[in-house]
C-alpha cells in the first residue's frame, strides 16, 4: 500500500479511480464483443462456442482403431449489461460480422452470422441481453435479414420490449427470444455457403394478480399471437400467477 505523509505521521494514501480500476481488473479476462458496438449494451462475458467433428474407424470388434479431429467452427455468444436505452433495430437477425481470432502470426478472421437474441427482464433485477450466432464461410455476406423493433431500458423491471401482450395483471418476468434458423453447408467440416430463414420472436411472460380474484388475461398485441394461454398456478398462501407465451413470425428482407 502507498503512504502519504500527513502531519506528524505517514498514513495510507487513497487510490485514484484509475489505480483502483487497474488493480480490480488485474488478471481478469476481457469479454469479446463478437457483434460490434451497440448503443446501450456493454459486454459482460463471452463464449467462443468452439466445436470440432471427429471421424472414427472401427476394427472388427467395434473398437475405435483410428480417429481424426477436423472442422473446428465457432458458435460465439456475448452477454451484455444494459447501461442505457437499447433500440432493438440495431440488432439484425441474419446479419454477418467479421471478427479476428488470435493475434500476431496466428490471427485469423472469421465470419459469423447473428442468429439469436435473448433478452431477460424481471422485477428487482437488471436486464441482460445475450447475442449468439454461428460461423459461416469466409466470404459470406448477408443474404436474408430480419428486423426487430422495440426499446429496452436499463430499469430493473419486467419489460414487454416488443409489445407482445395486453394484460390485466402485473408482469413480474418477461423473456424475449428472437431467432432465425441458420443453414450452413460444409465441405470437410469447413463452411462454404450459408443462408437464414424462419425469423420469429417468442415472448414468455409471468404475471401476478395482486387482487387475488383470478382475473388474469393476456391478449394479442403488436402482431403477436398468444400461442400458450396463461397457465394458472395457485400457490399456498400467495397470489395467483400465470405464465403465457406469445409468438410473432417475421418476414425477411433480401439483400440488395
Ranges and model annotations:
Residues 18, 23-82, 104-134, 143-211, ...:
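Solvent-exposed edge beta-strands and adjacent loop segments
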Residues 85, 139-141, 212-213, 254:
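Short, cysteine-centered beta-strand-loop-beta hairpins and adjacent loop/turn segments enriched
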Residues 85-92, 211-218:
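Short, conserved charged micro-motifs
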Amino acid at each position: 500500500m502507498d503512504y502519504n505523509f500527513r502531519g506528524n505521521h505517514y498514513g495510507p494514501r487513497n487510490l485514484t479511480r484509475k489505480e483502483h480500476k487497474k488493480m480490480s481488473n488485474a488478471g481478469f479476462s476481457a469479454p469479446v464483443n463478437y457483434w460490434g458496438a451497440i448503443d446501450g449494451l456493454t459486454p459482460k462475458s463471452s463464449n467462443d462456442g468452439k466445436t470440432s467433428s471427429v471421424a472414427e474407424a472401427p476394427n472388427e470388434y467395434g473398437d475405435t482403431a483410428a480417429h481424426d479431429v477436423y472442422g473446428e467452427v465457432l458458435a460465439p455468444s456475448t452477454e451484455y449489461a444494459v447501461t442505457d436505452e437499447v433500440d432493438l433495430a440495431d440488432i439484425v437477425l441474419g446479419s454477418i460480422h467479421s471478427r479476428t481470432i488470435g493475434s500476431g502470426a496466428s490471427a485469423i478472421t472469421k465470419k459469423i452470422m447473428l442468429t439469436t437474441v435473448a433478452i431477460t427482464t424481471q422485477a428487482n433485477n437488471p436486464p441482460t441481453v445475450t447475442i449468439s450466432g454461428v460461423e459461416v464461410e469466409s466470404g459470406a455476406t448477408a443474404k436474408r435479414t430480419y428486423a426487430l423493433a422495440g426499446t429496452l431500458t436499463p430499469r430493473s423491471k419486467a419489460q414487454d420490449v416488443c409489445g407482445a401482450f395486453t394484460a390485466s395483471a402485473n408482469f413480474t418476468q418477461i423473456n424475449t427470444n428472437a431467432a432465425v434458423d441458420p443453414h450452413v453447408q460444409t465441405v470437410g467440416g469447413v463452411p462454404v455457403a450459408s443462408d437464414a430463414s424462419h425469423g420469429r420472436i417468442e415472448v414468455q411472460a409471468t404475471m401476478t394478480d395482486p387482487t387475488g380474484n383470478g382475473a388474469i388475461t393476456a391478449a394479442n398485441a403488436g402482431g403477436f399471437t398468444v400461442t400458450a394461454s396463461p397457465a394458472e398456478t395457485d400457490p399456498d398462501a400467495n397470489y395467483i400467477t400465470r405464465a403465457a407465451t406469445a409468438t410473432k413470425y417475421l418476414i425477411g428482407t433480401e439483400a440488395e
